[in-house]
């Protein structure tokens, strides 16, 4: 049972008991218990708790941020090779009046939407669509903003047959050489190569309770411990939290969230995001393309220097 399910269970218990006892003296007041449980759960969240917060069904997805932060949005479709991918949102729009290209891994807000966008797991068509729009952005001098929120690339046979690995690898190569600014925003889950394919950037901004790792804790536990139930233990070992990644130099800016998650006050987080994006775009747009690419390459090379 996740932390949010525990809290929901406590709320339902209060409702059911009060429904059966309508007298003022008999009514159950669980407010104190709820607050105590919330405080205990969220005061010092461990890595596994952060994974659960990042996966929370009511956590605002990329579509929320895009609608709140951009204007004149025109969605674009197709990779011009084999098809489209609903899990990859691509568009042009304006950020505070500046034309930008927007790429986002799309998750739904309910089961039907998640089925339509494959729970945020991209196919090769999605990565190729993203690359097509990034090359278009380079041609017209538009900064690129990518929103990462995926458990990983789609691992199905159809994706492998269409060249999933090649599509991801090509994005890594091409993004490292693009002549326009690239800023990546990690909203929830940043899983495996599926996230990396949108993360070769000049600056990375990450929400406080987001996670980013080579694979899921369940996958890590299955491979190394031969036991998927040890996922919580694996999460501690993987150093996947925003705080760990910031300390090791992988993430440039951390954006604070409410203690229980962004879903409690998304408007405040949007305002903070907007300010950070504005400041970073101003600085990056001042750089010549050769300096931009050199700095991006140097940033990537530093990752191998992390001390374990």
Please tell me what each predicted stretch does.
Residues 23-25, 126-127, 220:
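Short, motif-level signal for alpha-helix interfacial/capping segments enriched in acidic residues
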Residues 88-90, 127, 134, 232, ...:
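Hydrophobic alpha-helical segments
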Residues 94, 101-176, 182-187, 192:
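Cleft-lining beta-strand/loop regions that shape enzyme active-site pockets
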